[in-house]
């Protein structure tokens, strides 16, 4: 069993390269505006988004490959179903998990005793998986012993509005730390993908307290007032 900290997000080239130009063009048609100017299209898109007309974000497709994320986060990722996202997950039926990797939470890695217990537990699971396999148990059944902390891979397709809505919840300081790290990586990778994405990321990806100007959580972290 290996414990690693590795880059989690890769943006696939099918992702919309010029999201603001696309949005501005589509909106311009609706408004009867001149759509031949890229600068005007970008300005029109920024204006729409800044005014809260988020439906236009649904024109923008984002294709992502995620790796080295926990099975726990992968399972919870599926709860964000708005915008008809599509996803595939690495299959424990076909992939040999006899040497699986695991996510190491900081609260465990920073505690010597906790790290020891966590590592021992994972090693025991690994030995059990291998023993079941040697007894002729199919991979799909051996996988029943695998932990939620095991790393997995996802192939994802979202639109920008769906990802924006996810960021409201998952960039919150009360969200699970792994989600917050994933969104940091996602924003960094999209910002590198094109200049228009760098601008769009600054407009739409933020925790809901920043988006709404107040905290809407019952159990607030105290970062921002509830009123």
Locate each region found by the language model.
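Family-specific signature for flavin-dependent thymidylate synthase
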Residues: 1-227
């Amino acid at each position: 069993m290996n414990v690693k900290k590795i880059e989690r997000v890769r943006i696939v080239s099918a992702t919309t390269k010029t999201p603001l130009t696309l949005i501005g063009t589509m909106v311009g048609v609706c408004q009867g505006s001149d759509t031949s100017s890229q600068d005007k299209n970008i300005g029109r898109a920024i204006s729409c988004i800044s005014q809260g007309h988020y439906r236009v974000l649904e024109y923008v497709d984002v294709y992502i490959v995620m790796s080295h994320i926990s099975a726990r986060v992968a399972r919870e990722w599926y709860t964000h179903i708005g915008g008809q996202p599509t996803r595939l997950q690495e299959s424990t039926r076909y992939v040999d998990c006899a040497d699986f990797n695991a996510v190491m939470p900081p609260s465990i890695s920073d505690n010597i005793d906790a790290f020891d217990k966590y590592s021992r537990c994972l090693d025991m699971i690994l030995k059990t998986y291998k023993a079941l396999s040697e007894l002729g148990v199919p991979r799909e059944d051996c996988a029943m012993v695998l932990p939620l902390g095991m790393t997995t891979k996802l192939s994802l397709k979202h639109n920008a509005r769906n990802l924006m809505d996810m960021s409201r919840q998952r960039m919150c300081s009360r969200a699970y730390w792994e989600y917050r790290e994933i969104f940091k990586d996602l924003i960094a990778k999209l910002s590198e993908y094109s200049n228009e994405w760098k601008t769009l990321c600054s407009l739409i990806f933020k925790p809901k307290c920043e988006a709404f100007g107040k905290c809407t959580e019952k159990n607030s972290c105290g970062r921002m007032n509830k009123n």
